[in-house]
Amino acid sequence: MQFAATYPLAQIRRVQIYNNIKRYRETELDKILQETGGSFVFGGPIYLGNLTACCHLKGDGVVYGAPDYHVWGMAWGTDAQDYAMEWLPCGADNYVECVALVVEGEPLAAPHYQPDMGGRRPRQAIGTKEGRFAYLVTQTPYTPEELRDVLAAAGWDSAVMLDGGGSVCYRDRAGNGTGTTPAR
């Protein structure tokens, strides 16, 4: 199962980083849609069990993750019209990072990630394609390098892989979606 789309930035009112302090499970995304009024929702970056973000993460001006390094990630303002890949941390109202795969139209030769992010697993990614907001959520197991190659071949200008494996999830207003681990 796979969910993927691109949207012109002019059609997007908001891209929200939802801080899941209520600990909704991957199978409860409909609750997040109801709470936020969003059109669709999917998983994000890596979090520890105590809800601490492992990677650079900022939502509505609140920094949730600030590791001591710089890296490429997706950043945007309150209305998402400036949604683009930026060098993080940066001054944008919102940003997210996990594993950069495509930067300025070029696939990264050696994406940087820890061993637990490797291997073949379901994956999710965000980025841009032809100046549009792009996302992919797939149950197809890919290594980070295979996902990079798939996104680059599809013409993505920028891509950041988010958390994968059992954290891969998607739900839209029509009820379409997936949550990989109902027991989580």
Where are these regions (language model features)?
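Gly/Ser/Thr/Pro-rich low-complexity, intrinsically disordered segments
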Residues: 1-184
